Amino acid sequence: MRFASLASGSAGNCMVIEHGSTRLLLDCGLGPRDLASRLISRGLDSQQITGIILTHEHDDHAKGAFKFAAFHNIPIWLSHGTRVMVERYLPEGLSLDLRVIDSHQPFQIQDIEVAPYPVPHDAREPTQFVFSDGQHTLGVLTDTGVSTPHIESMLTGCDALVLECNHDLEMLKNGPYSPALKKRVGGRLGHLDNGSAARLLANLDNRKLKHIIAAHLSAKNNTPELAQAALAAVLNCGREWIGIANQVSGFDWRSL
């Protein structure tokens, strides 16, 4: 199994998870031309995508999914709450294969097993995912205000983690956001700060961990160096070992 990011941040998110002939997009918050270009940068063609999994309905995660899926005749997996909230995206006159999932029930998409889990975020029924090829697991957590025991039980023992490090608390406090937006981002249904991500990581069994990527970094309230330092301190490793998913280019393929 291998995985890459096409983009990560408030302007658009999309990951690719691949095993065998199965290639899944996790979220699709990119326009069609941008998505096609970024897939080419990872050596892929749009026709090679098996399907799309959505974490929640926010624009930066979902806005490009439905036209892409309709054009390429591929299914979309999403929670019931997300399904209810995405009506505004659905293209008129085009049929879509929307597959509603139970956020506590694993399911199989060809060569990849997908284990969903609910998270606290300000969306209708937000869900994050752990992916497995039968030998290795990739845990993804990109939009949550806080950790929970269930989140940690899902992510413990993974071979790879993509972990939200959205903001530095001091930078958010002193940054340009309005008081209301600061409260939202830093709240229990907002986004995970560097310190909270580090504490979550410290609660996991990381003995099998081969890759860790800090994701969904705020351009105004964080820096890659701060996110790397927070996670590296937990793992007792050099900062350079902590990967960064950025807005411009995501991150290149990582293999398990």
Where are these predicted regions, by residue range?
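Conserved beta-strand hairpin/beta-sheet module of binuclear metal-dependent hydrolase folds
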Residues: 1-42, 127-143, 160
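Structured catalytic core of nucleotide-sugar glycosyltransferases
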Residues: 4-14, 56-65, 87
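Active-site neighborhood of phospho(di)ester-bond hydrolases with catalytic His/Asp-centered motifs
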Residues: 26-29, 50-57, 77-80, 139-142, ...
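Active-site metal-binding motif and surrounding structural segment of the metallo-beta-lactamase
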Residues: 32-78
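Metal-dependent catalytic neighborhoods of phosphoester/phosphodiester hydrolases
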Residues: 63-72, 87-89, 222-229
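Metallo-beta-lactamase
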Residues: 80-128, 132-135
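Cap/insert and terminal regions of metallo-dependent hydrolase folds
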Residues: 149-246
